[in-house]
Amino acid sequence: MKYILSLMLVFSINLFTEDSEYKYEPEGNAAEYYIGNFNKGKDLDDLLKWYGKFSKWAEDKGVYDDMSVAILTPYFHADLASMDAMWVNNFPTQSAQYAALNAWMTQGGPELLKSLPLTNSRQVSTFQWVISTPADPEEGDLMVAIYTDCKFEEGYDGRKVYDLYKDFAIYAQSQGDTVGRKMIFPSAGYDGDADFVRLLYTSSIDGMGVNQELYWDKLDGSEASQNLKGFSCSNPREYIGRPMRGM
């Protein structure tokens, strides 16, 4: 009995150590990325009009109330011909994501899709960890979103990097930073080799410039910046975004 109790005590200590190993509990959500090119004779205005059709179709389904939508177009990008637009759906949970997918597939979504003025070449499902959120947008603002492919360095994983990034973001916000940050983990539909995709975004275009200057003036070289390690990133792509609902 004494031996069994000792084992139970060791097991309990190990569990506590594992639970307390990380500083923060990530705030997660699910997102879908629909990437494509406009059909002949169609453009962004047509896609924005089609959003109106989608919004009207979705309003009585009961599963889209907590979904946010943004439509992004590439601006600083290494291959502008590869895509014209990216439609992004964000859901609070994966259950909400798949409840919406079920409604789409069984309540008329495929029929509505026939009028989409864009042909998707990639559809990617992801899970995201929120590190920080941007300033509240003002009416009419366009957002900026920068996606970068990242790899973990030896000895680091998602939870370790998340804690370091969260520490950095908290310090950055104390200095006036208003950048939204996410660690995105792509799954179905993704054929790249990144461990995660970093998203940096601001709720206005000029906000990105202000925050970049703030980084070099106040954040670069700080202890929080020096502690932000364990990963490296490449291939940044910058988009202009139109928040359509819930952003």
Model-derived regions: residue spans:
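Sec-dependent N-terminal signal peptides
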Residues: 3-12
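Short S/T/G/P-rich N-terminal loop/turn motif that feeds into the first structured element of a domain
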Residues: 17-247
